[in-house]
């Protein structure tokens, strides 16, 4: 009996190791089935929106999502699916989620609402950081954007909100929020280290922030 238990444990460990080693498991599910599976497994849905001609999309699928460490992390937290935005169900999903660039990735709750949005690919280490922000409710795009729209976003949360907007690829919103904060801060506060993020985002020579920096001596 003891030998059987040991053998069973060894086989299970071997199976789990192989699952992790295979990289991210993209399941062959419809979007509705993915949401249902996420409810069953108490996970979120990770959706990869790609096209057949997109070079960065191919790079993510071939060189990033195939990594064992990517599989270990992603498979533990998500029901992962991918859809070609120009074929089948992907055509409707592209419109539903307003996908404008490729690749775009979504972290979606089991009720179908978006928790976080990621525009563009990257190397695994950086991509993991971006995904991790979306996993954490208080640093996710949905949470921070809702707080902002309600006028309840605390000053210390603004850097996280700007980062979430960057993750989503919303460059106009990044600039608008940084300009908003810039206009509200005193000169002393603008020079404070925790507020320097407003000068690091979407700033050109004609920007008031650029003019401000040119007039001060640091």
Task: Outline where the language-model segments fall.
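Structural alpha/beta surface segment adjacent to cysteine/selenocysteine redox centers
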Residues: 88-102
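Non-catalytic, surface beta->alpha helical segment in thiol-disulfide oxidoreductase systems
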Residues: 100-140
């Amino acid at each position: 009996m003891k030998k059987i238990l040991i053998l069973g444990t060894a086989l299970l460990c071997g199976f789990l190791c192989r699952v992790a080693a295979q990289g991210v498991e993209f399941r062959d599910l419809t979007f509705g089935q993915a949401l249902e599976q996420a409810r069953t497994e108490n996970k979120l849905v990770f959706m990869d929106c790609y096209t057949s001609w997109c070079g960065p999309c191919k790079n993510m699928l071939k060189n990033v999502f195939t990594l064992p460490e990517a599989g270990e992390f992603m498979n533990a937290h998500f029901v992962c699916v991918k859809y070609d935005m120009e074929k089948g169900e992907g055509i409707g999903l592209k419109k539903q989620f307003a996908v404008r660039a490729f690749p775009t990735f979504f972290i979606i709750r089991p009720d179908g609402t978006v928790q976080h949005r990621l525009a563009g690919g990257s190397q695994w280490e950086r991509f993991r950081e971006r995904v991790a922000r979306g996993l954490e409710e208080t640093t996710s795009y949905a949470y921070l954007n809702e707080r902002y729209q309600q006028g309840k976003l605390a000053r210390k949360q603004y850097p996280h909100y700007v980062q979430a907007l960057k993750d989503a690829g919303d460059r106009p919103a990044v600039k608008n929020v940084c300009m908003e904060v810039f206009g509200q801060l005193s000169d002393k506060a603008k020079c404070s280290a925790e507020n320097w993020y407003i000068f690091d985002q979407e700033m050109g020579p004609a920007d008031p922030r650029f003019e401000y920096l040119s007039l001060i001596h640091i």
